Amino acid sequence: MRRLDLNLDGGIGNLLFQYSAALKLQNHFEFKVSLKELSPGLIKRLEKYVGEIEFSTSRFRSSSHFAQTSNLGRLTTKWEPSFSPCETHYSIRVRFLKGYFQHPSWYQDSLELVLKKLDTHRESASLHMPRNLTAIHLRRSDYVRLGWDLPMSYYDKALAIDSNINQGPIAVFSDDQMIVDLFEQRLSAAGLTIHNNADSVASSAFNDFFTIANAQRVIMSNSTFCWWAVKLAQSSNSEVVAYCPSTWLPDQKSNVLIDSTWIKA
């Protein structure tokens, strides 16, 4: 069985896609896959969400730790473009695999298993959730610099589409607290009820993820974090309504991430 080292890199959304790709490579192509984190703490973060990992793992070590051997020098790293289909054959020289693996052919075969692993935490979080919750997620940070952040007009349009939103509380999530505060002020001024998740549980990306996964409707950002939370929500409740942007990212190939059941706003 050929060995293949798959690199872990990025936030939890990217890590879940990489984990799904590793399952595909091992279960369908019979590679012996090892997961290697490119920065410290990524394996621990992934395990927090999915529990025990079925692969051997390699913790982060600085590049100066490694001595290049003649054997490793003949092996190569293959970069998989984010939205490219899964390949069925790799050169014998390919030993290291990098990428975000966001084409359905990479994750579809293992999606049910990954969602099942995530669902344990969703069920626990559901005990603290109000009924008929609407979750709104805004991705900022590096998206602002890259020009990928979604305009307020998208969120306003999604809010205007659904007349049932005012029947329950709204929770706003983002990696930018200032944006959360400003958005909540806008919603309050419009007469909508704000649910402050921090009142019931310590705020963190982990708790935000599973709160979104328990919402009745979600106005999504174009992030993989929100993508996975919505997939988890709809896997356990087919009545969950999700609103998404009409184009995921400027790269048109990214639209493969848009589910046919989501409502474009």
Residue ranges and their predicted role:
Residues 1-5:
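Extreme N-terminal starter segment of soluble prokaryotic enzymes
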Residues 7, 136-137, 173, 245:
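Short hydrophobic segments within beta-strands
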Residues 7-17, 145-147:
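A short, glycine/small-residue-rich beta-strand->loop->alpha-helix junction that serves as a flexible
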Residues 12, 166-252:
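Donor-binding and catalytic core of enzymes assembling or modifying cell-surface/extracellular glycoconjugates
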Residues 18-25:
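Short amphipathic alpha-helix
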Residues 38-167:
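Secretory-pathway luminal glycosyltransferase catalytic domains
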Residues 248-265:
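Leloir-type glycosyltransferase catalytic cores
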